[in-house]
Amino acid sequence: AAANSAPTAFDFTNQSDVPLTSSRTSANTVTIAGLSTGTSLSVSVSGGTYSKNGGSYSSANTTTVNGDTFKLGHTSSGSFSTSTTTTLTVGTGTGSFVTTTVAQDTSPNEFTLQNITNAGLSTVYQSVATQVTEITGTVTVSVSGDGSPQVKIGNGAWTSGPTTITNNDYINA
């Protein structure tokens, strides 16, 4: 019989909602099968590393025969909602492991800036600083309303234009 150029189809289980910049390994192990007796195929990996037969992770080219097992690994993206793919090529066959990072949470826990009653005309007032929580990464903040409102994040400068805030920062208006 002629030698095979690819094993039986294989693939790795994808992972979603993974943390940013985290070391990830495929949950499943694939076993090479379907090769003719005595057939050995070349193996390469792109976008990450592989572990062959439970060994150390490597990116070096190797060979495989029926019964060899593989897992894949890589570091997830440092950006929100972004996929990272590692592909194992065995002969002319391929299988991929994809991780997708968590989405950015831009909706903070509810917070209230106090109202001022009986405010004097042409008088500038400042709210009590309120902590913004339950957001991830850097989030844009804007302010609007009557009387040329401004916003200040932490010890930063007052601004009427958009600015940014991160989790646990304090906001004044």
PLM ranges: what are they?
Residues 39-41, 46-48, 84, 137-141, ...:
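Short beta-strand/loop motifs in extracellular/secreted proteins, especially
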Residues 81-92:
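A short beta-strand micro-motif common to beta-rich folds, especially ectodomain repeats
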Residues 45-56, 145-157:
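Short, solvent-exposed loop/linker segments at beta-strand-coil boundaries, enriched for Pro/Gly
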Residues 2-5, 101-108:
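Extracellular interdomain linker/stem segments of modular secreted and single-pass surface proteins
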Residues 69-81, 170-173:
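Extracellular/luminal low-complexity segments enriched in Ser/Thr/Pro
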